[in-house]
């Protein structure tokens, strides 16, 4: 993927960059793999805001992605590399020999015409999905399962890759992109390779309207609010927040305060991120 930079014909264009989309080979998605979902604008089933600053944006259709890679020992040919408006990674349309079509996350070096497969007998090459026990140590992987058969939930964004560091007994040691070292059961599957669209992190939004198209609404400063809406609010004109350190809208310390909840799977974390 290459980055396209515009001439500074306006303040928005001056700091504006987009993907060249040169790796995209098909513009229209596969209709059988589309699902329409209503935009919830950050609300839950009670209508309350659970994620701030979300809403609006371009209307999109969900592409049904095969995160489980449970079509075992059936080879498939990559028919197209497509753009997905709902994620940062590119997706690949795969035609399997039994006639089924599926979308998968596209690794960086996957090309149209490549043949991929999932299963214990698959070769550990880019795009193939295997159990961690069948993947050589040191291999870069993505779309990693935590529970066997549930589908990959880790390392799915553009340019991301984890590394298989070691295998011992029933567990494999994986280094995640955040630096966290985590144990994962060896019978869980992962896909070999690094996810494509590697330069996505270097894109510059450039203007507020582009964020609105992506479904992000403005972030209002707490000091600009009234005191009943934010701990920093109130006062006449510009004034200090009136406390020793900044707070979240719910009164918790905003800097350095641990917010990660304890989970049963925390015992599998060998080394924390950072």
UniProtKB/Swiss-Prot annotation:
Q: Which GO terms describe its biological process?
A: cytoplasmic translation
What Pfam families does its record include? Ribosomal_L2, Ribosomal_L2_C
Q: State a GO cellular component annotated for this protein.
A: large ribosomal subunit
Q: Which UniProt keywords apply?
A: Ribonucleoprotein, Ribosomal protein, RNA-binding, rRNA-binding
Q: Which SUPFAM superfamilies does UniProt cross-reference here?
A: Nucleic acid-binding proteins, Translation proteins SH3-like domain
Q: Which regions form coiled coils? A: none
What residue spans carry the region label Disordered?
1-23
InterPro entries (UniProt xref): NA-bd_OB-fold, Rib_uL2_dom2, Ribosomal_uL2, Ribosomal_uL2_bac/org-type, Ribosomal_uL2_C, Ribosomal_uL2_dom3, Ribosomal_uL2_RNA-bd_dom, Translation_prot_SH3-like_sf
Which GO MF terms does the UniProt record name? rRNA binding; structural constituent of ribosome; transferase activity
Tell me the subunit arrangement: Part of the 50S ribosomal subunit. Forms a bridge to the 30S subunit in the 70S ribosome.
The family assignment reads: Belongs to the universal ribosomal protein uL2 family.
What function does this protein fulfil?
One of the primary rRNA binding proteins. Required for association of the 30S and 50S subunits to form the 70S ribosome, for tRNA binding and peptide bond formation. It has been suggested to have peptidyltransferase activity; this is somewhat controversial. Makes several contacts with the 16S rRNA in the 70S ribosome.
Q: What's this protein's name?
A: Large ribosomal subunit protein uL2
The organism named in the record is Dehalococcoides mccartyi (strain ATCC BAA-2100 / JCM 16839 / KCTC 5957 / BAV1)
